[in-house]
Amino acid sequence: MIMDFVSFFEPASLLYAAMVFLSRVVDVSFGTLRTISIVHGRTTMAFWLGFFEAAIWLVVVSTIVQTVTEQPLLVIVYALGFATGNIVGIKFERMIALGHLVLRVISRHNSNEIAYEIREQGYAVTAFKGEGRSGIVTELYIVCRRRDMKRILKKVMALDPKAFYVSERAGEVSNVYRPIMQPMTGWRRVLKKKYHSPSSALQGFSGEGSSPSSLSQLGRAERHFPGTVLRCRPYVPFLVISFASEMRPPDTARAFSFGQRCGLARLTPPCISQRALHGTSLSGEALVSG
């Protein structure tokens, strides 16, 4: 027994134990993700996770059975890998945050401001009036992606630190409104382009590559969206005007009408008419003929 204990700490044995441990961690992590994928109805992901889980498990178990009598401490390594794999799988699933959830926010104060701010970020909010122990309260009903919950709650708590909220997993969802402009993080922030203001963009044009009619269209855009034109790029014989506006109704209807007259080349979000009806932010690019 003592000889088995000593031989376990030899370099070759330690490397073998590390491989068993890591393989078991990966195996169980795949199993955890597979179970969650089945619950969410993601059949393709569940299929491939189950395939690799079974393959890794078969290799590890067949190897352990052959050597466990010679190195009994591998049982502990195997068990530690199993336990660690559960934690790693749960942590990884929380990080990727698959699926959607229903978020209910109950507030006594600033409920209108909370609903407005959340809608301005691109989410749909339904408000209900109710009565609590201390008086009238408002319940805000929000369906969003799980990865967006922290962003929404941060805005809620900034407006009402005493707000009560509860979340639950959503099954099938017919339509989910997503944030219009995602904050750039990591490598995306490094690659982020610097936008120029309308005045600096106009100063950069010498008339070459853009016709007077294109510049007049840019002037129209500035009049319709004061302070919201982000940049303009000359593409002979076109001029692309990028704009982003956070307006309340009925300004969104006017913005949609202007976008139709200019001929929108790309819309963010795709369904701009629904966004206009909900009074949320509007962004896009107008491709204007020169």
Curated annotation (Swiss-Prot):
Signal peptide: none annotated. The chain crosses the membrane at residues 15-33, 45-65, 72-92. InterPro entries: DUF2179 (IPR019264), DUF5698 (IPR044035), N-reg_PII/ATP_PRibTrfase_C (IPR015867), UPF0316 (IPR022930). It is a multi-pass membrane protein. Pfam families: DUF2179, DUF5698. The keyword Nucleotide-binding does not apply. GO terms for cellular component: plasma membrane. It is found in: Cell membrane. The keyword Membrane applies. Keywords: Cell membrane, Membrane, Transmembrane, Transmembrane helix. Its main location: membrane. It comes from the Bacteria. NCBIfam families: PRK04164.1-2. Belongs to the UPF0316 family. This is UPF0316 protein DP2912. It comes from Desulfotalea psychrophila (strain LSv54 / DSM 12343).
